[in-house]
């Protein structure tokens, strides 16, 4: 096969979900939890030929007998052995491809430590023998997916949120801000406030149920205090949810109290600024001449920006912080849950990008540090 016919693989490794597929496609083929599970008790199931580890959906479905671990914490890989298992699962079980036959585009968190990028590069070339690879910053890919090269991206996933100002395709590292508050924290917070209502959710398996409640029923209030008053005086905001055992629970103000923590981290006992203030602070760290372009191109990305009402609230809050004459535009594409992956798919299929890949030959000559020279 000649190089032109080989589709590149695009793998977006998130703290919560791994998204993988082929460059040129408009959506990822595989989306599965970034988890590795190991049996809690040895040999419970006699004759099952029990594996020593399970990845993704299989780990999720067998969660009752496993201990689940997330190898990516706050967007950054912390457990490389488990990460390798996730990549192996991605190539061989999900996409069913031979990684030695395809260039691979990986994504990384903004401000990812140098040693981490090198380790990713090394594993791709030495363990999986890929012919070529590239590492791209997640938020930059989201911006590309929205058809822009300048703007500020608020990327909020399961493990971490970042505000990343980008000018003419380049992230501005001095102005990137990280907020360790994301989907997993919101799920934990919802578990806590549902417990106050008398429903008990404690185990990792029950956390998944609460995550589903969060995704299906939560929303962001435009005016939090006003919404609290409405919730107290009527049942119009109440919704019911059926648990796997058939029990039905009712949730009211929890629906918007949970995501409100993104705007008021003090709800979680955190001293950090909310996502609106973090976005504003990021813009203020940029050169005064480009701020106008950032305000007018504020792009939301990641699963934790999927709450209904979030764009209107961001518009209102940033409007209150910015100069009164400033034009502010919040862009919330419907496919933003996967916009990092989509941006990667676009980038890896551009003809102009083909000379950007790090080839196996370049890696063999320079070693893992080549990644800092070719990917920025």
Swiss-Prot record:
It holds the Pfam family Actin. SUPFAM superfamilies: Actin-like ATPase domain (SSF53067). It comes from the Eukaryota. The modification Methionine sulfoxide is found at residues 45, 48. It is found in: Cytoplasm, Cytoskeleton. Its main location: cytoplasm. Its EC number is 3.6.4.-. It catalyses: ATP + H2O = ADP + phosphate + H(+). The keyword Cytoplasm applies. It is an enzyme of class 3 (hydrolase). Gene3D superfamilies: 3.30.420.40, Actin, Chain A, domain 4. Keywords: Acetylation, ATP-binding, Cytoplasm, Cytoskeleton, Hydrolase, Nucleotide-binding, Oxidation. GO terms for cellular component: cytoplasm; cytoskeleton. Residues 1-2 form a propeptide. GO terms for molecular function: ATP binding; hydrolase activity. Belongs to the actin family. Actins are highly conserved proteins that are involved in various types of cell motility and are ubiquitously expressed in all eukaryotic cells. This is Actin, acrosomal process isoform.
């Amino acid at each position: 096969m000649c190089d032109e016919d080989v589709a590149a693989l695009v793998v977006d490794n998130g703290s919560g979900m791994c998204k993988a597929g082929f460059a040129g496609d408009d959506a990822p083929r595989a989306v599965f939890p970034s988890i590795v599970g190991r049996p809690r008790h040895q040999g419970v199931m006699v004759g099952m030929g029990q594996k020593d580890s399970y990845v993704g959906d299989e780990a999720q479905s067998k969660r009752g007998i496993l201990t689940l671990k997330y190898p990516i914490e706050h967007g950054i890989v912390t457990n490389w052995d488990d990460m390798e298992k996730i990549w192996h699962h991605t190539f061989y079980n999900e996409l069913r491809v031979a990684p030695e036959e395809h260039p691979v585009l990986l994504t990384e968190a903004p401000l990812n430590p140098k040693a981490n990028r090198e380790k990713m590069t090394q594993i791709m070339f030495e363990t999986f023998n890929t012919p070529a690879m590239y590492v791209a910053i997640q938020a930059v890919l989201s911006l590309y997916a929205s058809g822009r090269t300048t703007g500020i991206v608020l990327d909020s996933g399961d493990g971490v949120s970042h505000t990343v100002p980008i000018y003419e395709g380049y992230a501005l590292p001095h102005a990137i801000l990280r907020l360790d508050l994301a989907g997993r924290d919101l799920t934990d917070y919802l578990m806590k406030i549902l417990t106050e209502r008398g429903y008990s959710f404690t185990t990792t398996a029950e956390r998944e149920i609460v995550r589903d409640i969060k995704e299906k029923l939560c929303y962001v209030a435009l005016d939090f205090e006003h919404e609290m008053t409405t919730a107290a005086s009527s049942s119009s905001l109440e919704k019911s949810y059926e648990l796997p055992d058939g029990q039905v629970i009712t949730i009211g103000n929890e629906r918007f109290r949970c995501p409100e923590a993104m705007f008021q981290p003090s709800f979680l006992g955190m001293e950090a600024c909310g996502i609106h203030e973090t976005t504003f602070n990021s813009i203020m760290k940029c050169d005064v001449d480009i701020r106008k372009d950032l305000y007018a191109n504020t792009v939301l990305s990641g699963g934790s920006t999927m709450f209904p009402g979030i764009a209107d609230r961001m518009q209102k809050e940033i409007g209150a912080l910015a100069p009164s004459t400033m034009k502010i535009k919040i862009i919330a594409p419907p496919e933003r849950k996967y916009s990092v992956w989509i941006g990667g798919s676009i980038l890896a299929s551009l003809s102009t990008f083909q000379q950007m890949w790090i080839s196996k030959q370049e890696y063999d000559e320079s070693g893992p540090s080549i990644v800092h020279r070719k990917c920025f």
